[in-house]
Amino acid sequence: MSQVILDLQLACENHAGLPDEAQFQRWLDGVIPQFQEEAEVTIRLVDEAESHDLNLTYRGKDKPTNVLSFPFEAPAGIEMPLLGDLIICRQVVEQEAQEQSKPLEAHWAHMVVHGSLHLLGYDHIDDDEAEEMESLETEIMLAMGYEDPYIAEKIAE
């Protein structure tokens, strides 16, 4: 049986309207057990200032972003179930959901799925990688009862 341990950190000022720990756990459980049996993931919910600082420091991008993924790399020869950390910016997620006319809960779920896939080694730097990752995200989101997060982009093409 797979086990995903969640460490949820609420580092944003306003906690009203945030998904609860059970929702974050459900979203992680919808992704990670497909790839590995045990994992520990920290999800830290932050405000724009912290997201901006981290995005500038680690990605060279001078703005807040929706989700940042920091995979854990154990020292050679040591096996640990730590998968890594997801930093999710509340304001960016809420703004994107509104701009993209997506249900807020679905967009939160998508950020957890997207970030988890990054922790598992997936990326979207080139077109082939992006296509594979988006396909996995869509499959996982549909399995959890949400719409395809990329449906608007597919319709626009």
Swiss-Prot record:
Any one Gene Ontology biological process term? rRNA processing
As for subcellular location, the record says: Cytoplasm
| Taxonomic source organism | Salmonella typhimurium (strain LT2 / SGSC1412 / ATCC 700720)
- The main place the protein resides is cytoplasm
Where is Zn(2+) annotated to bind?
H114, H118, H124
What the record says about family reads: Belongs to the endoribonuclease YbeY family.
Q: What EC number(s) would the UniProt record show? A: 3.1.-.-
Cofactor note as given: Binds 1 zinc ion.
Per UniProt, the keywords (alphabetical) are: Cytoplasm, Endonuclease, Hydrolase, Metal-binding, Nuclease, Ribosome biogenesis, rRNA processing, Zinc
GO molecular function terms noted in the UniProt entry: metalloendopeptidase activity; RNA endonuclease activity; zinc ion binding
Q: Does the keyword NADP apply?
A: no
Output the Gene3D superfamilies linked to this UniProt entry: Metalloproteases ('zincins'), catalytic domain (3.40.390.30)
Q: Which domain of life is it from?
A: Bacteria
Q: Which Gene Ontology terms of cellular component type are present?
A: cytoplasm
| General function of this protein | Single strand-specific metallo-endoribonuclease involved in late-stage 70S ribosome quality control and in maturation of the 3' terminus of the 16S rRNA.
Q: Please give one Pfam family short name.
A: YbeY
Tell me the lineage of the source organism: Bacteria, Pseudomonadati, Pseudomonadota, Gammaproteobacteria, Enterobacterales
What's the protein name? Endoribonuclease YbeY
Under InterPro entries, the record lists: MetalPrtase_cat_dom_sf_prd, YbeY, YbeY_CS
